Amino acid sequence: MATSSRSERFPITPSTAATNRLTITPNSRVLKSPLTEEIMWKRLKDAGFDEQSIKNRDKAALIAYIAKLESEVYDYQHNMGLLLLEKNELSSQYEEIKASVDESDLTHMREKSAYVSALAEAKKREESLKKDVGIAKECISSLEKTLHEMRAECAETKVSAGSTMSEAHVMIEDALKKLADAEAKMRAAEALQAEANRYHRIAERKLKEVESREDDLTRRLASFKSECETKENEMVIERQTLNERRKSLQQEHERLLDAQVSLNQREDHIFARSQELAELEKGLDTAKTTFEEERKAFEDKKSNLEIALALCAKREEAVSERESSLLKKEQELLVAEEKIASKESELIQNVLANQEVILRKRKSDVEAELECKSKSVEVEIESKRRAWELREVDIKQREDLVGEKEHDLEVQSRALAEKEKDITEKSFNLDEKEKNLVATEEDINRKTTMLEDEKERLRKLDLELQQSLTSLEDKRKRVDSATQKLEALKSETSELSTLEMKLKEELDDLRAQKLEMLAEADRLKVEKAKFEAEWEHIDVKREELRKEAEYITRQREAFSMYLKDERDNIKEERDALRNQHKNDVESLNREREEFMNKMVEEHSEWLSKIQRERADFLLGIEMQKRELEYCIENKREELENSSRDREKAFEQEKKLEEERIQSLKEMAEKELEHVQVELKRLDAERLEIKLDRERREREWAELKDSVEELKVQREKLETQRHMLRAERDEIRHEIEELKKLENLKVALDDMSMAKMQLSNLERSWEKVSALKQKVVSRDDELDLQNGVSTVSNSEDGYNSSMERQNGLTPSSATPFSWIKRCTNLIFKTSPEKSTLMHHYEEEGGVPSEKLKLESSRREEKAYTEGLSIAVERLEAGRKRRGNTSGDETSEPSNNKKRKHDVTQKYSDEADTQSVISSPQNVPEDKHELPSSQTQTPSGMVVISETVKITRVTCETEVTNKVTTLDCSESPSEAGRKMGEETEDGDCNQTGINASETVIHNEAATEDICT
């Protein structure tokens, strides 16, 4: 009942709104708060809230609001933990990207070293070609030397003409051997040609590898773009989640503002209540002044009130006992608070343990995810390795297939045409797939133009070769004419021998060159393996290739200049050789003419004899010479073609590598741009997180400030409460003194009336003593039952004790026994007085004057106690009416109903009790007391006064006890407790029971007296 009235008095509390708002958020923890109501109350007490004032308000709303604040703090902590986890994930991704970039740098350095080694190998090849050219020059010089030697030997042949014929047959056999050697040389030349073809195949294989790498790069680009798209989608999702979090935080901020508004309203209400208390204090001051005036009037009467002081001492002892019981209760409350604090600490520890367990689970989940990712990465790496191995197998198969192809110019042209077709097809496919790769088409067009330029250059080189061949044919013709003129010479046999020696030396040189070529082939195989091993790390060298691109272009230009210079030098050497050859031919012609003149002059006769044999021999020699010259020319042409082919292949490889480097540069630039964009995004997210942190810290600081303000208000309220308590104690003490004085005044007034009635009572006392002896046992039982009823009323409440007494007491009780019982119930005489009365009754003698005085004193004491109780209840009713005026205005209908119910209840109980004293007992009483009929009016004066007092007290209790729940065990202390109720606000159900027992007793006395 009290809580409903208080909730109506405070309709401003945000109980429903706060709880309804809290249920909106999905992550709210209002219903899952680990704190109980006891812990909440303890925290409120520590924060400075008054329990009495809080109980007058809506407890549930305040607890829900506190739980809401705590849940919001928990949500903030949870969100902060999630943000930290996201930060750690982003940092790990950044470190992975950084590690991949470092690996790309390392691979780029390795590719750079491989490229430098390839350039060195190309230089070595050029040097070997230069050596071959020098060897050809040496052969030409050796041939010239042989011609000079032939001239010298021609003179010797003049002397040994006869011996030459026999040696000619031997020379024929030697020529046959030389033919076999020449065939062996041809085979060696074919082997060299096969090696050249093999190098060409290797070059084609490298081209195919480059194409496969381009395909891999395109695939990687596609995969990288897909990954970028997935990452962008993830970032969009994360931004959406962040926006949702911002909205939730804004809603929470609005809720905090609403809560602040409600707190301000409550503060205004507290201020109004404080003003009301100030007005009450003013009223108390006025009452103090009136009480002081009355005290001055009653100071003269203190000497005659020693008996009242003794009673006050007893009451003080009872009060001290009550205070001791209250202290015990306070100690029990302190123990309970300590238990609650221990429970709260245990709950906090449990919550912390649960949070730690949750964090550990999250850490384990994150570690498991990282392990899964690492495993997936390892699986991808293994799959890539397997793919590379499969590609190597495919490359080897392709190499075997390419080895079966022909390496003629027609096949190369067809291959170039096919490559052009493939490139065009690839370009169309790439245009269909990606419209952004227009640059690749331009590169392909450039490649086609470069190939056409190379074709034109090859054509020019073919024309130059044809011109050189024509010039060489002219030279050959001249040499043939010179050799034909020298056919007549016998010294040609010696020339053949020298030629054989030189050919042997050339064969040895060729064998050595072949061994060198084999060694170079092995070395190239090793380098190929290294190159293939390092080719896998090309992606890492992208950034270094950017820096070295300019250096490579410079080297390329220097290398091109170097090649041009070497070509110019070769041309100059050719021209010099041509000039030397012309000079030598002219000198040979001159010497031949001189020699011929001499021979004609000296050996005209000898030549005529051996012309036939010489002609046959010279024909064979000429054939052999022609064959040897043809072989030499073929070898030269093959060497030149192989050198040209190597240069072409090297230039093609160089161009392809340059294009690949450019593509890798572009890819690396794109990746760097993407990484920069991601870094910028991460920086923006970090700034947002920092701003969120600052905002949360500001909110937390505002909350702390509000808590500090509440603490200050708590201290102020505590000081006010202590002041009010001190004033209350003073007022209570003064009221008690005034009540005592009033009781004494009333007792003195009643003493005169009691003395007048004693004479009448002494006459009836003798007759009543006999009846008292019969009722002693019943009175004892009634006293015991009254004690039990008071205890049961203090514990269980309501009217159980009175019902027992009504059921146990017989209907044949006398009116005097009922009067005594009512006086015992109302005034509660001590057991000592009852024992004295029983003693006097047992003696059965006539009461003396001493007995009369004692009985008069007892009556006076009972009368004064009844008056004091009535005055205290009246004062309590006045105070209660003053305090509950606002409540009565808000709830008039409820109070009326309650009063009507209570009065009806009490009237019903009084009727039931009056039925017990039915009219059947009246004649018996009249029959037993015939002599006292005339004295009954005088004896009923006191009873009528007590009835009036009890009626007044009953009305005050009925009007006041409807809205209060606090009282004590005895009716004498009920008034004091009711006075304390207005300031303390304690509610106790046992007070209703005790007040009801008093009302029942008073109603019973009224019925009996009537």
From Swiss-Prot:
Q: What is this protein called?
A: Protein CROWDED NUCLEI 4
Where is the motif named Nuclear localization signal 1 mapped on this chain? Answer: 445-452
One GO location term (cellular component) = chromocenter
* Biological process (GO), any one: nucleus organization
Residue spans of biased composition, Polar residues class: 883-893, 912-921
Specify the domain of life of the species encoding this protein.
Answer: Eukaryota
InterPro entries according to UniProt: CRWN
Keywords, A to Z, come to: Coiled coil, Cytoplasm, Membrane, Nucleus, Repeat
Q: Which organism is it from?
A: Arabidopsis thaliana
Q: In which tissues is it expressed?
A: Expressed at low levels in roots, leaves, flowers and flower stalks.
Which parts of the chain are coiled coil? 82-350, 404-763
Observed phenotype of the null mutant: Reduced nuclear size associated with reduced chromocenter number and altered nuclear morphology. Plants lacking both CRWN1 and CRWN4 or both CRWN2 and CRWN4 exhibit slightly smaller rosettes. Plants lacking CRWN1, CRWN2 and CRWN4 or CRWN1, CRWN3 and CRWN4 are extremely stunted and set few seed.
Composition skew (Basic and acidic residues), residue ranges: 849-863
The subunit field of the Swiss-Prot or TrEMBL record says:
Core component of the LINC complex which is composed of inner nuclear membrane SUN domain-containing proteins coupled to outer nuclear membrane WIP proteins, the nucleoskeletal CRWN/LINC proteins, and, possibly, KAKU4. Binds to KAKU4.
Q: What ranges does the record give for the region Disordered, renumbered to this chain?
A: 787-813, 839-937, 966-994
In chain numbering, where does the motif Nuclear localization signal 2 fall? Answer: 679-686
What's its job? Component of SUN-protein-containing multivariate complexes also called LINC complexes which link the nucleoskeleton and cytoskeleton by providing versatile outer nuclear membrane attachment sites for cytoskeletal filaments. Required for nucleus structure organization (e.g. size and shape). Involved in the maintenance of interphase chromocenter integrity and organization.
Bilayer topology term: Peripheral membrane protein
Q: What is its main location?
A: nucleus
Location in the cell = Nucleus membrane; Nucleus, Nucleoplasm; Nucleus lamina; Cytoplasm
UniProt lists the family membership as follows: Belongs to the CRWN family.
